[in-house]
Structures are given as structure tokens and as C-alpha cells.
From Swiss-Prot:
Low complexity: compositionally biased ranges: 72-81
Region described as Disordered: 72-147
Name used for this protein in its record: Putative uncharacterized protein encoded by LINC00167
Amino acid sequence: MTEGLFISCSAVRVKPNRRAGLRRRSPAFLLSANQKTRLFALGSSPRCGPRANGEEASSCAWVSRAPRAACARAKPASRAPEGPVSRKTRGGEAALASARPATDCLRSGLAVERRRKPNSRPAPGVGSLPGSRPQDPQGAAGRRLSP
């Protein structure tokens, strides 16, 4: 169950593709059937599924709604006082948490994605700690020259 929540909480990223057919598909197309069922179980709209003609719905409700519920569950909620009212209070908190916008979750997902991108490489030797790896200019030059 945890991996399903993780998938729904992380931003679903569509890789750019030059073929127009894949570009027009929704992010739901990229998820496996198992992941879809987990996301649907979180309380999504039944309209967002494969249609009768086999196409996916263009804008799926669960893409916007499921991450909120998953993020709300992932955050530790404040404990309600024990007693007969505590269950109702917790349920209300969960309902309020799921109604909040998912900006925190999406922001953290984008930050993680930005950290992972290897596009900007630091200058050689800058990223490593001083003294952690001995810098051998002659050895590095020898490695570059060899095929």
C-alpha cells in the first residue's frame, strides 16, 4: 500500500515524445493497472477510466484529487482526545486535510526531481569534499588521453 501512496504523491511526469499520439495521452496512461486501482480506491471519480472506445479520459479527476488525499495521510495529524468523539474528530480532520490544495506535496516532488536532474554538472573537484579523493592531475590526464 505504501508504494501506491508514494506513486500518487510524487508528480507523474510525462516524458516529452515527438510522436503526437503519445503526447496527447493523459498521465493515467503511463501508470500500471495495479497503480490505477490503488488510486481509484482513494475516492476518485468513476468517469476517469478507460472509455468505451478504449481511449483514456483527457483530464482525470484522480490525478488532481488522489495526491491530496495521499499527502494528507502521509502527514502526521494531531492526536484527538481519546473518547467517543475522537473518531469523528479524526474523520473530520482527514476530510479537511484532503480538501486542502496539494501545493506542499507537489512542491516537494518538484524539488526532489530538480535535485535528481544531472543537467548542470559542477566543475571537476568542486562537488567532492577536500581531501576525500586525492587529486592526481597526471593520472587524470593519462586517463583522458587513453582511448
